[in-house]
Design a protein with these regions (language model features):
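Extracellular/periplasmic bilobed ligand-binding domains
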Residues: 1-3
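Extended glycan-interaction surfaces of carbohydrate-active proteins
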Residues: 9
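The substrate-binding groove and active-site-proximal loops of carbohydrate-active enzymes
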Residues: 30-37
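Short strand-edge motifs at loop-to-beta-strand transitions and within beta-strands
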Residues: 183-185
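Aromatic- and carboxylate-lined catalytic core of secreted/periplasmic carbohydrate-active enzymes
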Residues: 6, 14-17, 25-27, 39-178, ...
Length: 204
């Protein structure tokens, strides 16, 4: 998505970049990734990565139920005929909560401001949104990739003071952090396992 974004910028006409139908929950035709490659959880993480590239995603419905699949309900989430077995968009709710908590439309991808596998959207000097994909349990030296996968992550900031908070991409839990100072900040370890996001806003 970042590459497509750069190609579009070079045309001089900036338009939204959309990843269409990147995943249908539990859709496993012979040419698709094997389970759990299209699970609700994997697609939730994919949606975060698309959003952190400054792009939009359009998601399909469950391939297990709905139109032409017993019990044929005639649809799913989009037309209100889904059921409790369709869980993918439940995970997306937290992503919406995160992005609507700041002026996301004023930010641009700035992955050069972070390292070691993190993603960053920023309006430098004002807003920094950082996403940390799932990392291994980093307290165990038994992890084969411990030294590589558990390296610290730094964020380059414009000078100033920023309010900061963790946001669980899985549960929506918010964990406030002490004020952060630029120009370089080493992120603390996330409060829990799985993937987390960070939001920093300049203190006025």
């Amino acid at each position: 998505m970042l590459e497509e974004r750069q190609i579009q910028i070079k045309t001089g006409r900036i338009i939204p970049q959309t990843n269409e139908e990147y995943g249908y929950e539990d859709h496993y035709p012979h040419w698709a990734p094997t389970p759990p490659g299209e699970s609700a959880e994997v697609l939730r993480q994919t949606a975060w990565q698309i959003a952190m590239a400054g792009a939009y995603g359009t998601a399909g419905e469950s391939a297990r139920r709905g139109t032409n699949v017993w019990p044929d309900t005639g649809g799913g989430w989009i037309n209100g005929r889904g059921d409790d077995s369709m869980v993918m968009l439940k995970g997306y709710e937290h992503m919406v909560d995160f992005f609507t908590s700041f002026e996301w439309w004023k930010t641009e991808p700035h992955d050069e401001l972070v390292n070691n596998g993190a993603y960053c959207l920023a309006k430098p000097g004002e807003i920094y949104a950082v996403y940390l994909p799932i990392r291994p349990t980093c307290g165990s030296g038994e992890n084969f990739d411990y030294q590589k996968a558990c390296r610290g992550i730094t964020l380059k900031l414009e000078p100033g003071s920023y309010e900061a908070k963790w946001f669980s991409a899985v549960t929506g839990e918010i964990v406030p952090l002490p004020a952060v100072q630029g120009p370089v900040w080493t992120l603390p370890e996330p409060p829990g396992w799985l993937d987390w996001a960070l939001l920093l806003k300049k203190v006025k």
